[in-house]
Swiss-Prot record:
Organism: Caenorhabditis elegans
Bilayer topology term: Multi-pass membrane protein
Sequence similarity: Belongs to the nucleotide-sugar transporter family. SLC35A subfamily.
Name of encoding gene: nstp-4
Name of protein: UDP-N-acetylglucosamine/UDP-N-acetylgalactosamine transporter nstp-4
Xref: PANTHER family: NUCLEOTIDE-SUGAR TRANSMEMBRANE TRANSPORTER
The entry's keywords: Golgi apparatus, Membrane, Sugar transport, Transmembrane, Transmembrane helix, Transport
BP term (GO), one: UDP-N-acetylglucosamine transmembrane transport
Amino acid sequence: MNRANDTSSNLKLISLVVLIVQTTALVLTLRYSQTQKSEGPRYLSSTAVVCAEIIKLITCFFVIYRNNGYRFSGMLNELNREIFASPQTRADSLKVAVPAIMYVIQNNLLFFALKKLDAATYQVTYQLKILTTAIFSVTMLGKSLHRYNWMALILLTAGVALVQYPSGDSTTSKSTAAEHDASDNILGLGAVLAACFSSGFAGVYFEKILKTSKVSLWIRNIQLAFFSVFGALLVCWLYDWQAISDDGFLRGYNGVIWIVVLLQAYGGLVIALVVKYADNILKGFAVSLSIILSSFTSWLVLGDLTITTTFAIGATVVIFATFLYGHEPKSTPAEAHNA
């Protein structure tokens, strides 16, 4: 039993560290791709999402193929047994469509919010997803959070908001905000809040599926990627169809962009590992720390970021919140007696 607990703890730690490294590498590669001078049109992020989901599918198929002794028939038998064999397995597979659909809704809400809000309001408000994730973890998974945990989550939300706050000229921010009237702001805030709840619900729902089912992580990722591909293609059609028609699906792609796509694809698999062996709340802390690490590295190496006082305060708050969340409060004599 202790060996199983040790293995689970090791997998939790390893998956969190890998997530921090992967997210940091992804952000830095994205920043580097923005500094590249390229002839012709830039690549479309919507098509990159489609490519990433397809790569996830191929990778998961290969892992199952390998686990079955590199036998194609063995892979097909496992897929049939876990996904198609009975009405129960088919219904179970459809459960994964819920987070996939929620992610599509979330992305569309964020597209809408970006058109209605200035960057500062959008970035700060969207950090509420940290709190909605915690709320759904308590209500859907029965997770118990101490007051120290809630304090840490509130501080984390505030710290990430400060880190992500745009560092541009204040007069520019004011003029940009002035372009949006009151009704735009209300609609934009409503869209961001809805996206926060969508993000929290989808993440925790997928966590519940992973932790309450005997279906392998790779099968679950195949199911999620399958539904996500259709969602990503829908976004391409809604927002970038004209550009794709004019310049092609892979317009603007080069070596760096393909690295971004690969990091995005395998990042999705790492997130699934984190959700299975840790949880969505710890995932939020890992991603927050990677934002700070990538920003600092970008300032140090690429020189495309200015470290402001706001960023420094936010980074300090995030680090403090991380330690506070890991704080184990001493039990009172009464609690110790009851235990």
